[in-house]
């Protein structure tokens, strides 16, 4: 996984008690801008049910920030598509307690009920669906995992906190995405962590009467990384299943052109790479002690590409540099499936490697390795033939989830629908299908498999906090968002209020005390600069129950500081003023102030109690 970039829906989100270093993408960054075509609820039909296979799908919370057709939200999910949804990602504090990665994951004024609840509400229409919160990811790094796993005391802090957190928000399990444990110490500590996590989940289930939380992990596919980090015989009994990241075997970080996720080896590449494929990785995990039924094979809905050094040398094994930035993903060498189908519709040539059983496409000097319906079908046949536990996807949002490709024939999720059909007997409808939920979906386990059910009752919030209630369309702004794109709009009756439009729904919001919303600037500013002449009044506040968290109310961004140049995404302190900080997104800087007398701590990248030693230097 590489650190990704993303666009903020609300550029004034403040990282109070959240270390928000930019959106994380498993194994590849993605920032997509396009025209959106939103699909809501749909029904599924069933073909031959094959109930023994697990079909998890990773949901990325930052896909909500994309624009147009590429914007993905939980409501774009189709019932029956997956057996499990893994929410990427949960995060960890320096004291090893867990927290939300993004304020939008939790209920707040501008995001409504929050992504956690929106994802878990999918279980209302997909009654067999299970959800897990995945902790970690590539950009999370290894240091916090290593520190947390180093002692029984610190492991207990994480485990107890994680169990409470996922129960509070209605998840059915915990997924560990440590990329990657390495060395004898990490190997031993990783085993201890997983054993103690499993035991704690069993104890919690016994004391509460709830179904046990699932315990899973995303794991490496490269032989050397497997050997360096995983004591597989001692891990195997404690996992319900593992998610084998059988992709990113080749990418533009190296000049050698190869396949992102080949099923088998190819003689086109040097023999030293013969172990770098799906089959070899899955077999290796099994040979080292992981039961086949617990191995869930990874399926990418994205691809990797190169700019060929010689446009006439198109066979795998040639050389190149990263492919050009694509229209949506905006990261050299990485593309989404819905981009590849457009390339093919616009003249790219598709080739098929009969040995690796995957396609690649060439368009001029651009060479892309990707997966399509044919390679997905071949891999599903392989999973069934070899007896593995199922297949998972990274990610939901890189498939053509809304049938936006010009040659899609209206098929929603053309790649993931292959998994649903071949492993679950579920037929995903075409765009515009009947909007009723399936009465039955594929179950997640068969007799002899570890228990996979974990119906959770969301825990009532433990604390009371005073917040401004997010409301749908108000009387003074009836249908204000009808036909409008997502974004911020002025309140026609009150300069101190403004409206956030999301998916044609409106949310009333208010500026910090004394400020007014500027329709031209699109943020809150002084009354003299706002250009608004409507009488200003403050929005009422109500006391509501919420899950234990910290205040996320922020001050609006001021104008960009000319002297600061954004060289990477993230949060940065302002050396001349401890109360201020800068958020960089795609090379653009946004200025913020910490609220309520707090100061910005450069080490934690949070607003906290004033401490001059923590200010940016």
UniProtKB/Swiss-Prot annotation:
Residues with glycosylation annotation: 310
Catalytic activity, EC: 3.2.1.14
Positions of the GH18 domain: 53-426
GO cellular component assignments: extracellular region
Domain annotation Chitin-binding type-2: ranges: 478-534, 563-617
Catalytic activity reported: Random endo-hydrolysis of N-acetyl-beta-D-glucosaminide (1->4)-beta-linkages in chitin and chitodextrins
Disulphide-bonded residues: 57-82, 511-524, 594-607
Pfam families: CBM_14, Glyco_hydro_18
Active site, renumbered: 179 (proton donor)
Binding site for chitin: 109-110, 136-139, 180, 245-248, 394
InterPro entries named in the record: Chitin-bd_dom, Chitin-bd_dom_sf, Chitinase_II/V-like_cat, Chitinase_insertion_sf, Glyco_hydro18_cat, Glyco_hydro_18_chit_AS, Glycoside_hydrolase_SF, Glycosyl_Hydrlase_18
Top-rank lineage group of the source organism: Eukaryota
Keywords, comma-separated and alphabetical: Carbohydrate metabolism, Chitin degradation, Chitin-binding, Disulfide bond, Glycoprotein, Glycosidase, Hydrolase, Polysaccharide degradation, Repeat
Top-level enzyme category: hydrolase
Molecular function terms from GO: chitin binding; chitinase activity; endochitinase activity
Any Gene Ontology biological process: polysaccharide catabolic process
Family in the record: Belongs to the glycosyl hydrolase 18 family. Chitinase class II subfamily.
Name the record gives this protein: Probable endochitinase
Gene designation per UniProt: cht-1
